[in-house]
Design a protein with these regions (language model features):
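Cytochrome P450 core scaffold surrounding the K-helix E-X-X-R motif
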Residues: 1-2
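Histidine/acidic-residue-rich, glycine-tolerant segments that coordinate divalent metal ions
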Residues: 5-15, 21-22, 28, 34, ...
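Short acidic-aromatic active-site loops that bind/stabilize oxyanions
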Residues: 16-17, 285
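A generic alpha-helix surface/boundary motif
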Residues: 25, 58-59, 192, 224
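Metal-dependent amide/peptide-bond hydrolase catalytic core
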Residues: 129-310
């Protein structure tokens, strides 16, 4: 962490680079408000503090859903700090908001040899380079440009010596999309492309493809309700309806697959602010108060409205 803040992380490689500490602070603030007016609440509010949100393969949200604690919940709302939106605004988008996120690991095994005698080996680095180009070609040429699909190789490891043809390469990456059928498609095509690679270049490859978060899809009526709350408590100028969704992922999707609701983006953007997951990421703490107000009001007014309909 390079923020220089007095509460900066003291552990190398570990920091709050995605704003989840501010999410907890906001929810605790909302809890304090709701507790102070609990006698006026016409129902129960359950608060979820994002356990294991950053772990895509073992998301905490799915564990919460599986526990059954949300079985009697009528609607659910959440937020995430969002540097792409200005401080003082809230992003409210109907439908697709954030993508599904899958994780894959690939091992391409060749045969090492002296760098002067490549014909006596099977170069796993050349094979890996070939495969990466094939992936990009599949995404660019087999996918409708209007259908969102992103595949990124984030890790590639292979080779030990400059003059030795590499015998093993390990790759790791992610695929993002909004459509379940696209997840099926890309998993199948990654496997098929490795099989073709093995036939062409005499490698032996394996694919370990793991499904992560599903797509975060907001209920239109829930967004309309949240918009009315933002307008009432933060002002109409605070409302932003983003034109495009994000290819980032969020385990709140597990809740929205089960319960009507919406996920909101709380603007934290200021001049020169770094992106999420950057070592210099921080927030403008001015966003905490409106975040608290919004979340408390969403819960309190929902219960009031639900009670009046009975």
């Amino acid at each position: 962490e390079t923020t220089g803040l007095p509460f900066a992380s003291q552990n190398d490689g570990v920091m709050h680079a995605c704003g989840h500490d501010s999410h907890i602070a906001i929810l605790l603030g909302a809890a304090a408000i709701l507790q102070s007016i609990k006698d006026q609440l016409h129902g129960t509010v359950k608060l979820v503090f994002q356990p294991s949100e950053e772990e895509a393969l073992f998301p905490g949200a799915q564990g919460i859903v599986d526990s059954g604690i949300l079985d009697d919940v009528d609607e659910i709302y959440g937020l995430h700090v969002w540097p792409q939106l200005p401080v003082g605004t809230v992003g409210l988008k109907k439908g697709n908001l954030m993508a599904a996120s899958d994780h894959f690991l690939v091992h391409i095994k060749g045969k090492s040899t002296h760098g002067a005698e490549p014909h006596n080996g099977v170069d796993a680095i050349v094979a890996a380079a070939n495969w990466i180009v094939n992936i990009e070609s599949m995404v660019a040429r087999e996918t409708n440009p209007m259908e969102n699909l992103v595949c990124t190789i984030g890790v590639i490891n292979g080779g030990d010596r400059y003059n030795v043809g590499c015998g093993d390469v390990h790759l790791e990456g992610t695929c993002r999309t909004y459509a379940p059928e696209k997840r099926d498609y890309i998993e199948r095509r990654l496997g098929e492309s490795l099989q073709a690679l093995d036939m062409l270049l005499k490698t032996k490859s394996t694919l370990d493809y793991k499904r992560g978060h599903g797509a975060t899809i907001n209920n239109p009526d829930a967004i309309d309700y949240a918009t009315s709350i933002v307008e009432k408590y933060l002002g109409k100028d605070a409302v932003v309806h983003p034109e495009f969704p994000s290819m980032a992922a969020e385990d709140f999707s597990a809740y929205l697959h089960k319960i009507k609701g919406a996920f909101l983006w709380l603007g934290t953007g200021f001049e020169g602010n770094p992106a999420l997951h950057n070592e210099a990421f921080t927030i403008d703490e001015k966003i905490l108060e409106p975040g608290i107000t919004m979340m408390a009001a969403i819960a309190a007014e929902f219960l009031q409205e639900k009670s009046s309909l009975k």
